[in-house]
């Protein structure tokens, strides 16, 4: 509808009925000039009683709430008189100011109260009971809310998602609006998460020429960033030009000219390699080339160790009461003589035994060995299986945000290396090229590196296919374990996992041992069954408590996606109660007792241990915890991440999601006592053999498939391995003189 056709209302906010702090959506009562109340819905971040506004929109009829005014645009004016200012502040407009404090401030400064709050906070300290620190805190809160409100109103006026404004303010602070006006394309940057289409629409409406170099260059960089999120280290130049041209409706020739400009300016790194005209983002080019050089150097290094490997093996077998298989002995021999070794194999093939053996051998030789894994859960599992502390790669390298907060830096690096003689890295298939390069750069020149993983599992979420490329290069000493040891091969989880990996169809009707299939043809029936399994059947019949059960799904979307499953599981496992405070955030409710997962790395968040004996910073993507408190007054929640206690403001809840159910990708690197795998319809890109295989291998004692056999068979038959543009394999072979 044309803006000129919109109706206009004006008045003063009487009350706020509902507000969504994630996206600014608000339902409020507006008192018009005649004193009549009107229900208005729209985007009004931090709306509070007492402020005046003019809203443009139309009347709509809600099926439940009746007639209300839906605002498309708004002009908001802060109150200017002392009574209105008091009403505004007393209504909770500014965090930390309630009715009593509002009365003190307004009585002191009258009509100038808001000016003092914004520009002269030191004057607030003249009031008894308000310290200088609190005065500054109140002023900061007021300025922040004013800034977010202006930014969100600007974004909403162009019909864009309000959440983008929230992210922008969190990232850029008070400069966000000015930066956005100067360059609308920052909306499409990785840290803001807007689509290029949204940024482009804003730019074009602001008058930017469709063929401008700024627009085309922004689209090119967006394509590279977008494809790095799909696992690519580079994009062939011709493909980059074609994709960008299609994205913004220009000719490929116009794009190619600007690619050349970006190459000349250093914003794109170009190289002809692997038969491709490869265009890289600079950070990915540097990571790939540097990682290849370090690995190649390590491959050329051998140790003329005088230790007798046969004596070492005999001593280890005697002390550990074990007899190593031939391939496990080969692992020990290679680890003794080479600087870098790869160990791969499926479930039950003895990878853990081999890790313990290598660790024991290094200990016997007086070597200091560090254990690490990509995720907190994988590191914890490594600790439990070896008896030695393991840490995440991020924690090992002491990751943190740089001074600008724009990117991550690692304290441990080439200029401040790790203190060790060897590193054993588990779940290597999850490691992308950026993280692998960071780890390699931090290794001491003589340190050994043992890379362990299952090459048939899903590749990393981030760019590259590092573990596979290293193995396929043929230049790194590699042992592939094939003999099944676990439970003497009696585990149906293990046997069926290997069948799935070979493309064979297990007999899903054979419900016995540790592998079961509950056939459900309707998604609603599957959801009901999964909920029942978690709440009663497994706890009561198999004595497996809900905290030891993990529900997995290939997808987030749909009835059998994690979002819907978590909604049902929360209602069943942690329903509302008087002693469980909760916070609505968007479409999600966070409640005391909820199982939650960190979904992005936060290097700065502070945590302490339960006993208060130690503290640190950093909660990382994939960490699982339980909400222990929800503080509505101070607007924060506390999460216990397996003994590490961290606090979150309500504005940081974007970093959390419920975790009774999670995607198979998120579960990679973890092992659970019992896994329930929900099989329903989803994108063919997700319903693949490697997704199925990865899901099955997450279960330690029990796996239950819930769904229909046809879906399972389709996944096994869908051997669809996504092609990733990466040149690590080729670089390794060239540097080692093979090509």
Regions from the PLM with identified roles:
Residues 272-347, 353:
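Pre-Walker A segment
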Residues 455-617, 628, 735:
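Conserved helicase motor core of P-loop NTPases
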Residues 502, 610, 621-739:
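C-terminal accessory regions
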Residues 50-52, 593, 622:
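Loop/turn positions that initiate beta-strands
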Residues 234, 329-332, 338-511:
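ASCE P-loop NTPase helicase motor core
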Residues 1-308, 739:
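Accessory, non-ATPase domains that flank or precede helicase/AAA+ motor cores in DNA-metabolism machines
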Residues 16, 55, 598, 627-630, ...:
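A generic structural signal for residues embedded in beta-strands
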């Amino acid at each position: 509808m044309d803006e000129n056709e919109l109706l206009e209302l004006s008045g003063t906010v009487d009350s706020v009925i509902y507000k969504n702090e994630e996206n600014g959506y608000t339902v409020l009562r507006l008192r018009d000039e005649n004193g009549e109340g009107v229900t208005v819905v729209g985007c009004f971040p931090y709306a509070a009683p007492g402020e005046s506004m003019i809203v443009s929109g139309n009347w709509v009829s809600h099926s439940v709430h009746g007639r209300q005014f839906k605002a498309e645009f708004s002009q908001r004016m802060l109150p200017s008189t002392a009574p209105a200012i008091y009403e505004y502040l007393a209504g909770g407009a500014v965090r930390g100011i309630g009715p009593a404090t509002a009365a003190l401030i307004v009585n002191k400064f009258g009509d100038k109260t808001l000016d003092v709050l914004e520009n002269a906070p030191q004057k607030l300290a003249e009031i008894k009971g308000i310290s200088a620190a609190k005065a500054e805190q109140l002023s900061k809160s007021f300025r922040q809310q004013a800034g977010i409100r202006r930014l969100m109103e600007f974004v909403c006026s162009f019909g864009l998602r309000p959440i983008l404004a929230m992210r922008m303010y969190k990232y850029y602070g008070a400069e966000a609006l000015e930066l956005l006006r100067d360059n609308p394309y920052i909306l499409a940057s990785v840290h803001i998460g807007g689509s290029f289409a949204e940024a482009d629409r804003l730019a074009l409406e602001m008058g930017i020429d469709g063929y401008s170099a700024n627009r085309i260059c922004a689209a090119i960089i967006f394509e590279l960033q977008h494809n790095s999120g799909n696992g690519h280290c580079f994009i062939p130049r011709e493909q980059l030009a074609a994709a960008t041209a299609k994205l913004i409706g220009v000719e490929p020739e116009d794009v190619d000219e600007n690619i050349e400009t970006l190459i000349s300016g250093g914003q794109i790194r170009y190289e002809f390699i692997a038969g491709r005209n490869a265009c890289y983002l600079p950070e990915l080019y540097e990571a790939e080339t540097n990682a290849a050089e370090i690995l190649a150097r390590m491959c050329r290094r051998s140790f003329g160790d005088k230790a007798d490997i046969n004596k070492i093996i005999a001593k280890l077998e005697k002390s550990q009461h074990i007899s190593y298989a031939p391939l496990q002995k080969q692992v020990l021999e290679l680890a003794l003589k080479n600087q870098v070794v790869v160990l791969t194999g499926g479930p039950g093939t003895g990878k853990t035994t081999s890790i313990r053996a290598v660790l024991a051998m290094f200990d016997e030789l007086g070597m200091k060995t560090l254990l690490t894994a990509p995720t907190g859960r994988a590191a914890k599992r490594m600790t439990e299986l070896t008896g030695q502390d393991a840490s995440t790669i991020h924690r090992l390298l002491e990751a943190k945000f740089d001074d600008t907060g724009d990117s991550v830096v690692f304290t441990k690096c080439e200029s401040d290396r790790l203190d060790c003689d060897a590193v054993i890295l588990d779940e290597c298939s999850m490691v992308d090229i950026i993280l692998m390069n960071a780890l390699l750069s931090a290794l001491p020149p003589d340190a050994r590196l043992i890379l362990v993983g299952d090459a048939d599992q899903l590749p990393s979420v981030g760019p590259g296919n590092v573990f596979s490329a290293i193995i396929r290069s043929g230049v790194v000493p590699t042992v592939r374990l094939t003999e099944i040891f676990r439970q003497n091969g009696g585990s149906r989880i293990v046997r069926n996992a290997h069948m799935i990996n070979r493309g064979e169809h297990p007999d899903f009707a054979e419900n016995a041992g540790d592998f079961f299939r509950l056939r459900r043809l309707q998604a609603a029936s599957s959801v009901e069954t999964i909920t029942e399994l978690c709440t009663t059947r497994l706890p009561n019949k198999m004595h497996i408590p809900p905290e030891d059960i993990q529900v997995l799904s290939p997808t987030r979307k749909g009835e059998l996606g994690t979002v819907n499953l978590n909604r049902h599981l929360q209602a069943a496992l942690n329903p509302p109660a008087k002693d469980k405070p909760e916070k609505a955030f968007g479409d999600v409710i966070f409640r005391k007792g909820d199982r939650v997962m960190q979904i992005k790395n936060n290097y700065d968040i502070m945590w302490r241990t339960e006993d208060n004996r130690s503290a640190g910073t950093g909660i990382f993507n994939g960490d699982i915890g339980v909400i222990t408190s929800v503080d509505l007054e101070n607007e924060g929640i506390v999460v216990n991440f397996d003994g590490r206690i961290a606090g979150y403001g309500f504005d940081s809840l974007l970093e959390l999601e419920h975790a009774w159910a999670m995607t198979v990708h998120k579960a990679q690197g973890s092992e659970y006592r019992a896994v329930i795998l929900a099989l329903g319809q989803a994108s063919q890109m997700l319903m693949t053999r490697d997704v199925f295989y990865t899901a099955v291998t997450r279960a330690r004692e029990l796996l239950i498939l819930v769904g229909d056999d046809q879906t399972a068979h389709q996944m096994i038959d869908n051997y669809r391995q996504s092609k990733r543009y990466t040149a690590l394999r080729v670089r390794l072979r060239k540097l080692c003189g093979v090509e």
